[in-house]
């Protein structure tokens, strides 16, 4: 069973990496103003060394009662996927997740939902979280019109509800 879970994780990791054009690690903040765009990444500090929360982020985390690291004694992996387009891998990934009883979270954009309603239904039916990744995948900090900003969330939620018949889970992964 352990080897199977490792296989699922490695398969997902390989598929995720193969679909990325660049991978960046680090954290940056341009300024402390309210309209600054924050970039949030992982900084690898070496083997057996926990990542450190960037000093610039500690106030933000405290303000929203959020955390950077969970219980480090607990061995938990959160498996997440960004679904912006479909290359035929998702049904295969869902098969493995189902067979191994591994839950995952899929962050989807509106066009993905519209183009793949059966896959979306299957994700939800099999107990996975299907979460919001925006309508058009913009840099959210660049949207100055409040209605356009709101629509990036609500347009996705509405089409999800039409297809699945229930509200979309309230998790959002901002596009970078």
Regions found by a protein language model. Name each.
Residues 31-50:
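Helix-enriched interaction subdomains in cytosolic or periplasmic regions
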Residues 44-144, 148, 155-161, 165-170:
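Active-site beta->alpha N-cap acidic-glycine motif
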Residues 20-33:
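Sec-dependent signal peptide cleavage junction
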Residues 1-12:
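N-terminal Sec-pathway targeting helices
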Residues 15-19:
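Hydrophobic core
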Residues 12-13, 24:
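Cleavable N-terminal signal peptides
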Residues 176:
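Active-site microenvironments of hydrolase-like enzyme catalytic domains
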């Amino acid at each position: 069973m352990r080897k199977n879970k490792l296989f699922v994780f490695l398969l997902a990791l390989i598929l995720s990496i193969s679909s990325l054009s660049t991978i960046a690690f680090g954290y940056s903040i341009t300024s402390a103003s309210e309209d600054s765009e924050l970039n949030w990444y992982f900084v690898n500090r070496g083997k057996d060394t926990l990542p450190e929360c960037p000093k610039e982020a500690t106030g933000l985390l405290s303000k929203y009662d959020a955390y950077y690291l969970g219980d480090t004694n607990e061995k938990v992996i959160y498996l997440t996927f960004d679904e912006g387009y479909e290359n035929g891998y998702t049904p295969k990934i869902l098969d493995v997740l189902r067979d191994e009883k591994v839950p995952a979270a899929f962050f989807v954009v509106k066009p993905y939902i519209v183009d793949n309603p059966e896959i979306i239904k299957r994700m939800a039916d099999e107990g996975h979280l299907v979460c919001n990744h925006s309508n058009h995948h913009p840099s959210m900090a660049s949207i100055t019109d409040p209605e356009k900003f709101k629509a990036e969330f609500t347009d996705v939620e509405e089409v999800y509800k039409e297809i699945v018949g229930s509200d979309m889970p309230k998790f959002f992964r901002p596009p970078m």
